[in-house]
Each structure stands twice: as C-alpha cells, then as structure tokens.
Amino acid sequence: LNVRGNLLIGELAEKLDFPFKRNGSLVLCLDEKDYPNLQKLYEKGITNGVKKLRILNHDEVLEMEPNVSENVYAALYAPTGGIVCPFNMTIAFAENACVNGVEFRFDTEVLNISRISSGTENWKIETTSGTYETKCIINAAGVYADRFHNMVSEKKIHIIPRKGEYCLLDKSAGSHVSHTVFALPGKFGKGVLVTPTVHGNLLIGPTAQDIENKEGTNTTRDGLDQV
C-alpha cells in the first residue's frame, strides 16, 4: 500500500491542490558493523517493489548532503520519497469527500456499538447526536480504537499511547538538508529524522515515549533535549 500510495500521491496533490514535493530520502548507516542491516533494508524495499533504490558510499552521501556526519559509512537512497503538509492534505481529502457525498458529524461522541440483524444492516451505533444503523464500521479512532473494539469483541485490548515530540525550526534553517534523512530503524521504529518541510522549515524528531494520557500532547524539556 505504501508503494501504491507513493505512485498516486503526485496526481492527488495536483487534483486536490495540496503541497507535495518528491525530495527523496536517505537512511544513514554510521558504522560499518551496521551495514548488513542497511543491506537488509535495501532488499526488503526491492521485494516490496520500491523503484530506483540504491546504496550510496561515504563520498556519495556527503556529495548529496554535505551537512550530515563525516562519520557516515553508507546510506540507502530512495529517490521516490516525498514530503507533504499532513494538515493541508487531510483537509483536502475531507473537502473532496464532502463534495462526493460524505456527511460529517462533528462534536458527536459514540456511546455504544452493538450487533443487530435488521434487514441489510449489521451494526447499531448510539451517539450523542442520534442512533445510526449501518452495514459496516471502520474503526479509525487512533488511540481510542481500543474503546470501540472492546464494545463489540470478547478479546479486550488496551492501547498504550506513544507520544512523539518534534522540533520545528525556522525557515532560515530549511536548507540544511534537501532530503528526508533517517537513521537506521531500530526495534521501536524509525527513530529521529531530519527533513525539510513543504513550507521551507526544518523538522527534527520525533521522540518516542509511552504515556497513559491519550490526550497528552504537551511538549517537555527532556523531549527537546533528546531531539
């Protein structure tokens, strides 16, 4: 799906009028002993159908991005990588959905979900703005997805939110890198990245911290120091 979406995003950006730039991405390998992991990442990308992947040596990386560490050993280069503004893109998708008949119910809390057998409908959704019956439900509630899952499933789950903090730098720093630069992924994710934004800023982050408060979006001094 990532590969398919990557192929479609340029056309969607043009049709729906949201900013998109195919700036390419680099995954850096800073130590020779980690090179086999970079090779595995390359092979996984080829298996998944990512086009034009290649591994760059030390000199090629520094020629492409002079501001990365002199200690860089190699990097995986994906010229198909790109950046968007997620806020503009989401609003554009919502506007397009509305034009095509989707109805939004804002300020509406789901109180309960239950199975029914009423004609062609399978589910009843009780909310603060009324009751709805539908054939299917897509649970896209993010960190609250466990709440709705547990309304209908005997196998209960509990989502532990993981908070990530970013540092958004001024546009005067936006030219420090031209590609999206990743570290080699670890077992908990991609780690901290450095990327230009479509608006000309420089974005660094995120951290990764397990929290209990599902609405804990505050930033911290420790998070900034880590970034």
Where are these regions (language model features)?
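A structural signal for short hydrophobic beta-strand segments in well-ordered beta-sheet cores
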Residues: 28, 110-116, 194-196
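Active-site substrate-recognition segment that forms the wall
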Residues: 7, 16-20, 131-132, 141-227
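A short, glycine/Asx- and small/polar-enriched loop/turn
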Residues: 33-36, 64-72, 114-124, 174
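Helical element adjacent to the flavin cofactor pocket in flavoenzyme catalytic cores
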Residues: 76-136, 144
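Short beta-strand to alpha-helix junction loop
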Residues: 3, 28-37, 76-95, 105, ...
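General beta-strand structural signal in soluble alpha/beta enzymes
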Residues: 54-57, 104-106, 139, 204
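Dinucleotide-binding Rossmann-like beta1-alpha1 core, especially the glycine-rich loop
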Residues: 1-64, 191-192
